[in-house]
């Protein structure tokens, strides 16, 4: 599979860490590490913004999606507050990961911990076309559990 080349700036507090990387041959997301100076403890029900120590320059027409790691959610109840988070092509600041602890125990984020995944995806920009009505479908306006069995 062909890829795109993306410029990445490592910030001073990134030193000694790994760039985001794919952890298996066909992984869609690259794991992102925490660039914390000291351990960060996230108590149950609390949130923390975790620095990554990197900034990226995405090409026009692409976004980076910051997604939870399933293992953190399953084992610790830790996920992202805004999942997925979107990094726009014109953003040049440090990428931060906003974690929340839904678990019962404090969660410790150590330097170099893999805290999220980054997926690079194409973006489709739309032009709206207002209409007084929409084409009818079998589903219609059924949503929020409309396919649940009674």
Swiss-Prot record:
Q: Which pathway does the protein contribute to? A: Pyrimidine metabolism; dUMP biosynthesis; dUMP from dCTP (dUTP route): step 2/2
**Top EC class per UniProt?**
hydrolase
**Gene Ontology biological process:** dUMP biosynthetic process; dUTP catabolic process
Give the keywords, sorted.
Hydrolase, Magnesium, Metal-binding, Nucleotide metabolism
Q: Which family does it belong to?
A: Belongs to the dUTPase family.
Q: Molecular function terms in GO for this entry? A: dUTP diphosphatase activity; magnesium ion binding
E.C. numbers: 3.6.1.23
Instruction: Decide whether keyword Cytoplasm is in the record.
Output: no
Checking InterPro entries in the record gives: dUTPase (IPR008181), dUTPase-like (IPR029054), dUTPase-like_sf (IPR036157), dUTPase_trimeric (IPR033704)
- List cofactor names only: Mg(2+)
What residues does substrate bind to? 69-71, 82, 86-88
Q: What is this protein called?
A: Deoxyuridine 5'-triphosphate nucleotidohydrolase
Q: What is the species of this protein? A: Syntrophus aciditrophicus (strain SB)
Q: Which residues form the signal peptide?
A: none
Write down the Pfam families for this protein, in alphabetical order: dUTPase
According to its UniProt entry, the function of this protein is described as:
This enzyme is involved in nucleotide metabolism: it produces dUMP, the immediate precursor of thymidine nucleotides and it decreases the intracellular concentration of dUTP so that uracil cannot be incorporated into DNA.
Question: According to its UniProt record, which reaction does this protein catalyse?
Answer: dUTP + H2O = dUMP + diphosphate + H(+)
């Amino acid at each position: 599979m062909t890829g795109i080349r993306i410029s990445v700036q490592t910030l001073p507090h990134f030193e000694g860490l790994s760039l985001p990387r794919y952890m298996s041959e066909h992984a869609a997301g690259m794991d992102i590490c925490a660039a914390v100076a000291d351990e960060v403890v996230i108590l149950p029900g609390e949130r923390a913004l975790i620095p990554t120590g990197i900034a990226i320059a995405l090409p026009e027409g692409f976004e980076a999606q910051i997604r939870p790691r399933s293992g953190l959610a399953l084992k610790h109840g830790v996920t992202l507050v805004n999942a997925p988070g979107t990094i726009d092509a014109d953003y040049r600041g440090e990428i931060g990961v906003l974690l929340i602890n839904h678990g019962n125990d404090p969660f410790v984020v150590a330097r170099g911990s893999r805290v999220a995944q980054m997926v690079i995806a194409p973006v489709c920009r739309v032009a709206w076309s207002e209409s007084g009505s929409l084409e009818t479908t079998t589903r219609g306006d059924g949503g929020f559990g409309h396919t649940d069995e009674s």
